[in-house]
Amino acid sequence: MEKRTDYCGNITEKYIGQDVNLYGWVQRVRNLGNLVFIDLRDREGLVQIVVNKDSGKDLMEIANSLGNEYVIQVRGKVVKRSEANPDMKTGQVEVDATEIIILNEAKNPPFEIKDGVEISEQTRLKYRYLDLRRPEVQKAIILRSKILRATHEFFDENGFIDIETPILGKSSPEGARDYLVPSRIYPGSFYALPQSPQLFKQLLMGAGFDKYYQLARCFRDEDLRGDRQPEFTQIDMEMSFADEQTIQDYTEGLLKKIMKDVMGIDLKTPIKRMSWTDSMNKYGCDKPDTRYGMLIHDLSSIFKDSDFKVFSGAIADGGFVKGIAVKNGAKEYSRKKIDKKADFIKRFHAKGLAWVKFEDGEFSGPVARFLTDENKEALKKEFDLEGGELVVFVADKWKVVCDSLDHLRREFAKETGIIPKGVYDFVWVVDWPLFEYDEGLGRWVAAHHPFTMPDDEGVKLLTTDPHKAHARSYDIVMNGDEMGGGSIRIHKRSIQEDMFKALGFTKKRAYEQFGYLMDAFDMGFPPHAGLAIGLDRFAMMLAGKDNIRDVLAFPKNASASEPMMHAPAPVADQQLADLGIEVEKQYEDSVKATEERLEKMAAEDAEENSTWDK
C-alpha cells in the first residue's frame, strides 16, 4: 500500500498546497447536492475531505456511497478552508479529494463511534473493537502507553535490568485466591499464575542482579471493584544494598519523569512523608487524600467528663471521640441528609453519628444541649470555627472511628466541592505496623507481606510481642489512592523463620512453601529492598477515569467475564480428560447451559452475518 503522508489529525496549515495520501474511517458524510463533506478519522483526530461536482461523476458517486465507519484511502490536495472550525485541530484546512478508494465497507454499528454517547458496559465490551475507536477511549490507552515508555526510559537510564519472571509458578495460600493452571504432565498438580513476582525478584537480588525492574503481569482471583481487574500490571522494582531513602528517591525520579512526559507537570520533590499513625489519626485511613483539609480531630480530652454518656462512656471504655468540621455545612445538610450518613457508617460498626451546627455564634443540634461553655470554647478553638460549619462526631473504638470518619470526610469533600481539580498530590506513608488484625479471618496477618523486614526494635519483638512490631515499609499515595508500596526485605533465615512463627506457620508449612527462599538466604544473600506501583490504577487516575477498565484494551467486566470472546467458557471433555479433571455433578447443568447459549449465539451470528455460503 502507498505510504500514508501523515495521520488525519495532523493535517494542519503546514500541509497547505501539498498532495497527501490518507487512510482512515468515515466519521460522517454530509451531502449538500453538488458538494460532499467527509469527516475522515484516525487515532490522531479528524480532517475534512471535500468532493464537489468538479471532481468528476465517478468520484461523486463513490463519495455518495460512503457510510459511517467505511475504511477508505483518500488522495488529494490540502487547501485552506473558507470558514475555519476553531474546535478542530485541523479546522484551518480541508483536503480537496482527487481519488477515494473504498478499502472495506461497514454495517451500521450498534452505537455511534463518538465521545459522549451513553453505552452500557456490556455493549461496550461485546463490541470492544468498536468502542476502542472512540477518541476518549483511544486517548486513555495511549496515555497508558506513554507511562510505559517513560518507565522503560527511566529504568534504562538508571542502570536497571529488565528481567521477566515466570507466569507459571507455585500456589501460595497467603493473600488473595490464586488462578490455578492444571498440569497435563503431572495429573492432580497445578501451577498458579503470579499474584506478584515478589519471591522471584528477591531471588534475583541473591543472584547478583542488583537493579531489577519489570512491567509485571499479575493475577488475583478476587471480588472486582472499579479499581480492580483479575489481571493487572505492576511497575516492579528491586535493588540490593538499598535502604528506604534509596528506593524512595528512585521512585520519586520515576514519578517525576512520568508526570512530566505524560502530563506536562513538574512534580516537586522530595515528596512529603507522613507516619502511618498520623495518617490514620488525621485522615482515618492509610491512604490519605491530602488535596484538601477537613482533618479529623481527636476530641476525647474535651469530652472525657461530658454529661453526654455516648461520649464519656465511649472514652471510659477505651474508645475515642473524634470529629470533622464541614465548612458551610450548616445550611447544606438537613437532619434527613445527616441521618443518611449515620445509616451508612453502620457498615463500619459505628453506633451512631452525633452532630452540631455553629451559626451566628451559637451551637444547635441534638448534641448542643450537652455542651458546656467550656466545651463550646474548646470546639471553636479546635476547629477554628468561623460560622456556618457542621461538626460531626463519632464515639467508638479507634478503628471504627477511623473507618467512619474516613468515609464521611471523603463524602463531604465531594459533596461540598472542595476537592481541587487537576491536582496530583503525592505523599509517602511510612512507619507501618508489621501486622494487622483481620476481623474476617479472626487472626493477625502481615500488613504488607511476610517478607517485610521489621525495624530494629521489631526484630526483637518478633519473638516476644510481635504485634507491637513496626515494619520498614512505605506506601506511595496519590489523591487518596494507594499507588504502590514497598519495603526493606528480610534477607536472613533466622528473621524469616521468626516472621513465619509470628504469623502462625508451622515449621512443616513454612519449609514446604518457602524452604527454597530460606535456603537461598544462607548462600550469601544481600540486603535488598523494592517497591511496586499499580500501573493500571495510576493510568486510570491520570486519565481522569473512574474505572480501571477504561485504560485496558480488552478488560473483563464486573463479573470477571469477557463478553466479546465469551471467556471464561467450557472446554471439550477430551481436554478435561487429558488433565484428569471432572466437573462435579452440581455444576454440570450450568456448564451445559453455558455451552448451549454460546452455540446458539454463534449460530445466530453466522446466520445473520456470514458470507460463508455466498
Swiss-Prot record:
GO cellular component: cytoplasm
GO MF term (any one): transferase activity
GO biological process: aspartyl-tRNA aminoacylation
The protein's Enzyme Commission number: 6.1.1.12
Cellular compartment(s): Cytoplasm
Chain positions recorded as ATP binding sites: R220, D221, E222, Q229, E482, G534, L535, D536, R537
Class of this enzyme: ligase
Protein keywords: Aminoacyl-tRNA synthetase, ATP-binding, Cytoplasm, Ligase, Nucleotide-binding, Protein biosynthesis
Top-rank lineage group of the source organism: Bacteria
Region named Aspartate: 198-201
One Pfam family per UniProt: tRNA_anti-codon
Reaction equations catalysed: tRNA(Asp) + L-aspartate + ATP = L-aspartyl-tRNA(Asp) + AMP + diphosphate
Stored InterPro entries: Aa-tRNA-synt_II, aa-tRNA-synth_II, aa-tRNA-synth_II/BPL/LPL, Asp-tRNA-ligase_1, Asp-tRNA-ligase_1_N, Asp/Asn-tRNA-synth_IIb, AspRS_core, GAD-like_sf
Amino acids binding L-aspartate: E174, R220, H448, R489
Subunit structure comment from the entry: Homodimer.
UniProt xrefs under HAMAP family: Asp_tRNA_synth_type1
Entry function: Catalyzes the attachment of L-aspartate to tRNA(Asp) in a two-step reaction: L-aspartate is first activated by ATP to form Asp-AMP and then transferred to the acceptor end of tRNA(Asp).
Family in the record: Belongs to the class-II aminoacyl-tRNA synthetase family. Type 1 subfamily.
Name of the protein this chain belongs to: Aspartate--tRNA ligase
Organism listed in the record: Lactobacillus acidophilus (strain ATCC 700396 / NCK56 / N2 / NCFM)
